[in-house]
Amino acid sequence: MTQENIPVQPGTLDGERGLPTVNENGSGRTRKVLLFLFVVGFIVVLLLLLVFHMRGNAENNHHSDKTMVQTSTVPMRTFKLPPPPPPAPPEPPAPPPAPAMPIAEPAAAALSLPPLPDDTPAKDDVLDKSASALMVVTKSSGDTNAQTTNARIQALLDSQKNTKQDAGSLGTLLHGTQTDARMASLLRNRDFLLAKGSIINCALQTRLDSTVPGMAACVVTRNMYSDNGKVLLIERGSTISGEYDANVKQGMARIYVLWTRVKTPNGVVIDLDSPGADPLGGAGLPGYIDSHFWKRFGGALMLSTIETFGRYATQKVGGGGSNQINLNTGGGESTSNLASTALKDTINIPPTLYKNQGEEIGIYIARDLDFSSVYDVKPK
């Protein structure tokens, strides 16, 4: 297009540049956009086709693998008929039956016993003429057979018992200790019952000296009520008598006292027969212990001292001006023998326990005490 063909727009000057036209550029840009969209759509379609194709191949491969696994695990089976068995050989002719022989009863009893648990093979039965009815069986032979039968039965039982014991230690651990059952019962008339296990507080009236056996007494310091706590059975001030023995030995610090009877201020008496205890319930009564040390070792120590000084004086007089002293030489054998004899006579002196009057002790009730024969309850 030349300049001559361009129409002159009104309001413009000659030589002035006019407005550019955009019609041609706009149409070219639209073509580019359409071409780009077409290319993008084509690529998307190709990608979708590729994805569907890959998924179909994966499903086909999975189906083929599953089919192969299933077909490979099925074993091949063949059905064949077993070969026919060979014909049985002809049976030999049966021998004629032997005449029946009567058998004595002891022999039949012996044959009915089970075999002993050993590895001895069973022997064939041999016809014994002594078992026939024509033979005479005496009483002694019958007793012998009975003893043999009992011996075989006992041996069989012992073998079975040993087999159970040899089963191992686990078998013994699976069996617990069998204990006898105990039945519960109710205490009768608890209003007049002082139950076993109660403790009576008591103060000594007499001094205890274990040198010789003796008697003892104490006074109850607290009221004792019935098992249900409703009835006063033993009043405070009741007297309890007992006895003790001279049985204290070396190393012992308690004495055993047996309290035998209780007497209330109202004249009610009952046999107690229960042991003494300390205020906390410990068995036995504690006290002061005299071990008699000087009585046991004083004579021997005195004789040993006399012997030592005698040897020293003898050596001092006979040794002149020597400054050395030997206490293991010289005479004094008779003095040494006297010391051994004295120690032998006094070493076994037993200790003595002393417990003064007025000290608090306890008495453990060892049995149920029933006062229903002397007491009664009346409604108010």
From Swiss-Prot:
Question: Which cysteine pairs are covalently linked by disulfides here?
Answer: none
* CDD domains xref list: VirB10
| Record's subcellular location | Cell membrane
Broad class of where this protein is predominantly found: membrane
Pfam families for the chain:
TrbI (PF03743)
Question: GO CC: one term?
Answer: plasma membrane
**Any idea what this protein is called?**
Type IV secretion system protein virB10
Which species?
Brucella ovis (strain ATCC 25840 / 63/290 / NCTC 10512)
- The coding gene here is virB10
